[in-house]
Amino acid sequence: MSNKPIIAWWSAGVTSAVACKLIIDEFGADRVRLIYFKIDSAHPDNERFIKECEAVYGKKIEIHRSAKYTDQFDVASKTRYINGPNGARCTLELKKNVRYKVEEETDFEHQVFGFEYDKKEINRAIRFIEQYPTAKAIFPLIENKITKPQSLHYLENVMGIQRPAMYSLGYSNNNCIGCLKGGAGYWNKIRVDFPETFAKMAKIERERDRQQLSEEQRGAGVS
C-alpha cells in the first residue's frame, strides 16, 4: 500500500472544504496535505473559516502564495490583462503556477479537487484529467454524487461549520472579492457590497485603456 501524500486543494469554498473532509475520512489526516492559495483580496471571514475547518480536520491547512503577485488586482495592474478567450490571467498566476510548483516538489499519490456533482463540473473534471494527466486528480464530490447544495448542508449540519460570509451575501463562490471573470450582474452587486473593490477595478481598467491608447498613438506616429 502506498504511503505517498495526497494533496487536497482547499480553496475556502464550500465544495473544497467538504471534499477535503471526505478525503481525510477515507485516507486519514496523516496522509493528506491541505493546501490553500492565499490572496490579499479574500474576505476577512476566511480566517474564521480556516480555523473552524482545521478543527474539524484535525490538522493545519498549509498556506501557499504567488511569489510575484498579491491578488487578482495586482496581476491585472502589472500585466494589463484582465480577462479574455484564454481566461483570466490571475488564475494562471495565483493558482496554476503555485500548483505546478507543489507538483514539481512533491511525490504524491493523488490531488483532490472540489468539483461538485453537476453536469458542467463533471465535464470540467473530464477536461482537467485530459489536460493534466500527471496531476492524478480525483474528485470526491463527483464520485459520491454530492451537489453544491448538498455540500452546503454537509458543511453546516455534519461538519458544524457556518458557511463563509460571501455565500451569506449571495455570491456563488468564495475565491476572492472582485472576480475578474464576473459578468455585469456580478460587478453591479460588488459595487453595492464592496464599493472600494469596485473603484479599484475601475481604476485599473482606466489605466489600462490609457496605456493602450498611448501605445496606439505612438505606433501611428501621433505625438
Q: Residue ranges of each PLM-predicted region?
A:
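Nucleotide-activated chemistry modules centered on ATP-dependent adenylation/adenylyltransferase
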Residues: 1-223
